[in-house]
Swiss-Prot record:
Essential for recycling GMP and indirectly, cGMP. The lineage of its organism: Bacteria, Pseudomonadati, Pseudomonadota, Alphaproteobacteria, Hyphomicrobiales. InterPro entries: GK/Ca_channel_bsu, Guanylate_kin-like_dom, Guanylate_kinase, Guanylate_kinase_CS, P-loop_NTPase. Keywords: ATP-binding, Cytoplasm, Kinase, Nucleotide-binding, Transferase. GO terms for molecular function: ATP binding; guanylate kinase activity. ATP binds at residues 23-30. This is Guanylate kinase. The keyword Cytoplasm applies. It is an enzyme of class 2 (transferase). Belongs to the guanylate kinase family. GO terms for cellular component: cytosol. Its EC number is 2.7.4.8. It comes from Rhodopseudomonas palustris (strain ATCC BAA-98 / CGA009).
Length: 220
C-alpha cells in the first residue's frame, strides 16, 4: 500500500541521524567516511567551517567553509554551530542549519570530528547522535600509516602520535568501537552499525499509526 494514509507504509518516514566517526589521525576514519558516502544512499558528509588555510585542490563550500577568526567567533556567539573545537591551533565547527534540514527530510549526516566535538554534539542532539570510535590495531601500525601517507613532517607526526593517546583515552564515551586492521572489514562493520541504527523504532516517524492501522484492519 502506498496511498499515503496513516495506516499505509508510505505514511512511515524515517528521521535522519547524525553518524559520528572519530579516531586518532591515521586510524582510517577519513577513508571510511569516503567509502560510506560513496556506498550508502541518503548519507551526506557534514561540511565544517574552519579557520585553517585552504589546501591545494580544496573548494570552499565543498570541503570546508573557510572563514577567518573574527567571522568564526561571530558564528559561535550567534549559536550557529552544533559543535566547535580548537584543533592544532585552528578552529573547526559544524553549522547547525544544514544538518537540521537534512535530518528533517530523512537524510543521515556523517561527522568526522574529535571527542570534544562529539560530546558537544550529543549534548545538543541527544538520541539523534550515533558515535563510532575507530582504533588502529597497534601503535606501530598507526605510526606506519602516518609516515606512509606522506602528508606531514616528522615533527607533525610526533605531535599526532602524542595526541593519539589522549584521543584513545575517551574511547568509552562512544556507542561503538571498531578496530581497523583491514579497511574492508572495518567498513562492513561500520556500515552494519549505520544500517541497524537506521532501523531503530524511535527513528520511524508514523510507525505507531502504521501498526495501529493494520491492527484495526485485522480486528475489524
Amino acid at each position: 500500500m502506498s496511498d499515503g494514509t496513516a495506516g499505509s507504509y508510505s505514511g512511515v518516514e524515517r528521521r535522519g541521524l547524525m553518524f559520528v566517526l572519530s579516531s586518532p589521525s591515521g586510524a582510517g576514519k577519513t577513508t571510511l567516511s569516503r567509502m560510506l558516502v560513496e556506498q550508502m544512499p541518503g548519507l551526506q558528509m557534514s561540511v565544517s567551517a574552519t579557520t585553517r588555510p585552504m589546501r591545494p585542490g580544496e573548494v570552499d563550500g565543498r570541503d570546508y567553509y573557510f572563514v577567518d577568526r573574527p567571522k568564526f567567533d561571530e558564528m559561535v556567539g550567534a549559536g550557529e554551530f552544533l559543535e566547535w573545537a580548537n584543533v592544532f591551533d585552528n578552529r573547526y565547527g559544524t553549522p547547525r542549519a544544514p544538518v537540521e534540514a537534512a535530518l528533517a527530510v530523512g537524510r543521515d549526516v556523517l561527522f568526522d570530528i574529535d571527542w570534544q566535538g562529539t560530546q558537544q554534539l550529543r549534548s545538543r542532539a541527544g538520541s539523534d547522535v550515533v558515535s563510532v570510535f575507530i582504533l588502529p590495531p597497534s601503535v606501530q601500525a598507526l605510526e606506519h600509516r602516518l609516515h606512509t601517507r606522506a602528508q606531514d613532517s616528522h615533527e607533525v607526526i610526533r605531535g599526532r602520535m602524542k595526541k593519539a593517546g589522549d584521543e584513545m583515552s575517551h574511547f568509552d564515551a562512544y556507542d561503538y568501537i571498531v578496530v581497523n586492521d583491514n579497511i574492508g572489514v572495518a567498513f562492513e562493520s561500520v556500515r552494519s552499525i549505520l544500517r541497524a541504527e537506521q532501523l531503530k523504532r524511535e527513528r520511524q516517524v508514523g510507525l505507531d499509526a502504521f501498526v495501529r492501522g493494520m491492527r484495526q484492519q485485522l480486528e475489524g
